[in-house]
Structure formats: structure tokens, C-alpha cells
Amino acid sequence: MSDTSKGIPQEQLPSQELHPPPMPVINLGHLSLDDPTVRSRVVNDIAKACRDLGYFQVISHGISQSVMDGAIEAASEFFKLPNEIKKEYASDDIRQPVRYDTSSKDGISMSRAFLKHYAHPLCDWLQYWPQQPPIYREYMAKYAVEVRVVALKLMEAILEGLGIGKEYMQEKFEEGLQLLSVNCYPKVSQSDTSIGLAAHSDYGLLTILLTSCQGLEVVDRSSNSWKVVQQLPHALHVHVGDHMEVLSNGRIKTVVHRAVLNPQEARISLASIHGFALHEKVSSAKELVDEENPQKYKENSFNDFLEHLTANMDNRQRNFLESLRM
């Protein structure tokens, strides 16, 4: 083991070999077909992936390659800006509508620069987004709008798969928040054991991830080991979030994942995080609670998550989901 680990715990070190996890690939276009048998099969495939793994990839999702490439380009150009421009958005206040920062926290050596900003309703938040590079607002907005459509389609299918109906709390989903986490992970040497982002699960209901190259790892539940996610052309990666586990009363489990650094090239990732509005409480669906399956989680909101995070900034064990278990 290289002594360049800089105090990284053994379980956090990047995987040394490629072990692709079982990765369901869902053709999302089939949800829109008139054939109810095909739709039912896709809904069942999504339900199984959420239940067994907590992640899957989608193709034929309706976002053009040019829109995806434009978002990656806008992100890449932002991170190439001089530091004095990027630092205009620097803040330790996690409630800022736009926030730029770099990661080296929790006593673990991490290498990441990120820009986070809200994206829905777009008319409320676009004015706060970076004006440099000139393409940023236009290209990123196109992607934000289209990926949100994908998220709503997925939410309908997941709720249908849970047996509570695709219209369940539809208005709350449509009026909910969207947060874009735009990340840049540097290229590193093979001997560098720094990671990009430590192991974590995502808050919110769903995260849809677009990446420029390989670097995502997930915990495979069957072996309790890290697995490298292979990069599929034109695919989006979907993560189940903490709030989905709460809403499903534990029928669906959030996925633990991390970002590792790529020795071939710098990596851009765009995580679009979707959930209820800031103060809207998420609780286990009453249809999924009974004597055999009592309520397992306390109701909570995205604002509750922010308060928990703020209160536990220096605590390496600040697992929000664990704090919700009853």
C-alpha cells in the first residue's frame, strides 16, 4: 500500500480492479409506448433495480447528445476560469443559492471542486447562476430543464412500482426542488490514492448523474464491496436517495457511492438532485405502513437535512438517514 494515502481509511481507498456491478439498463422510451405490457415490464424492471440495488442506468431518455455535451462543456469551461472569478461564488454557507467550494474534509484526502445551485423553478434561480463562461447559463439551463422531465417520468414509474400509483403526491413532485451539483475531479497519477468524493448516500428522492468519463463506484450489497460503474454511451446514472427510502418505508434502499479519480483524464460530473420543496415534509406513504410493516422513519424535509448538516460539519459520522430511523 502506497504511503501517499494521507490518512484515508482502508475502506475508502479506490478499488484496484474493475469489478462491474450488476447494472440494469432501462430503456426509458418504452414507458411512453402504447403497449401496456411493455410499460408494465419497464416499471417492474425499475422497481426491481430500486429494491435490489438502489441504482440503474437509463437510455433513450429523451435528452439529446448535444444538450448533454453542452452541459459538460459549460461545466468544464467554468472550472477553467481564473480562481478569482470562481471565488466570487465561494461560501461555507450551504444555504446559498449558488456555492463554489473545494473538498478536503472529514480528515480524508479528497480532490474535488464543485459548484452547486438550485435549478427549479428556473425563472427564480437562473439570475444567480454564473455569467462566466458566456455559455454557462444557456447550456446548463437546457440540460436542467430536460433532466427534470426525466426525473418526473422516473418518479411516476417508481411510485407505480411501489403500488401507490403514479399520481401519488404528483403536485409535490412537480413543485419540488432541483439542485445541480456540478463537479470537477482532477486527473491524477496511478500512485495517488486520493479520492474525489468520500462514501455517501444522496439526500432527496432521486439523483440523476451525467459524467464525462469513468470514476463512479457503488457498494454492491451482495458482497459489501466497492464496484466500479462502467461508462455507457449516452446513458444517465440514477441513484435512489435517502428520502426515497423514507417514502417507501424501507422497501427501497438508498445507495452508498463515491467518486474516485481517473488517471487518464479530469472528470466532470453533473448530479441533478430532485426532491420535495425545501420545507415540505417527506414521510412514509401510509399505504406502505401496516402492522407487519410499521413506520420505520421520522418525517423530515430538505431543510431538516441542511440543519443536520450544519450542526454536524465536523462530525465524520453525520449520517442523516440514520438519524431518522425510529
UniProtKB/Swiss-Prot annotation:
Induction: Induced by light. It is an enzyme of class 1 (oxidoreductase). Expressed at very low levels in roots, leaves, stems and seeds. Residues 175-276 form the Fe2OG dioxygenase domain. 2-oxoglutarate binds at residue 267. Its EC number is 1.14.11.9. GO terms for biological process: flavonoid biosynthetic process. It comes from the Eukaryota. Binds 1 Fe(2+) ion per subunit. InterPro entries: DIOX_N (IPR026992), IPNS-like_FE2OG_OXY (IPR044861), IPNS-like_sf (IPR027443), Oxoglu/Fe-dep_dioxygenase_dom (IPR005123), Plant_2OG-oxidoreductases (IPR050295). Gene3D superfamilies: B-lactam Antibiotic, Isopenicillin N Synthase, Chain (2.60.120.330). Residues 1-21 are annotated as: Disordered. Pathway: Secondary metabolite biosynthesis; flavonoid biosynthesis. Residues 1-15 have a biased composition (Polar residues). Keywords: Dioxygenase, Flavonoid biosynthesis, Iron, Metal-binding, Oxidoreductase, Vitamin C. It catalyses: a (2S)-flavan-4-one + 2-oxoglutarate + O2 = a (2R,3R)-dihydroflavonol + succinate + CO2. GO terms for molecular function: flavanone 3-dioxygenase activity; L-ascorbic acid binding; metal ion binding. Fe cation binds at residues 200, 202, 257. Its cofactor is Fe(2+); L-ascorbate. Belongs to the iron/ascorbate-dependent oxidoreductase family. Catalyzes the 3-beta-hydroxylation of 2S-flavanones to 2R,3R-dihydroflavonols which are intermediates in the biosynthesis of flavonols, anthocyanidins, catechins and proanthocyanidins in plants. Converts (2S)-eriodictyol to (+)-taxifolin and (2S)-naringenin to (+)-(2R/3R)-dihydrokaempferol in vitro. This is Flavanone 3-dioxygenase 3. The lineage of its organism: Eukaryota, Viridiplantae, Streptophyta, Embryophyta, Tracheophyta. The gene is F3H-3.
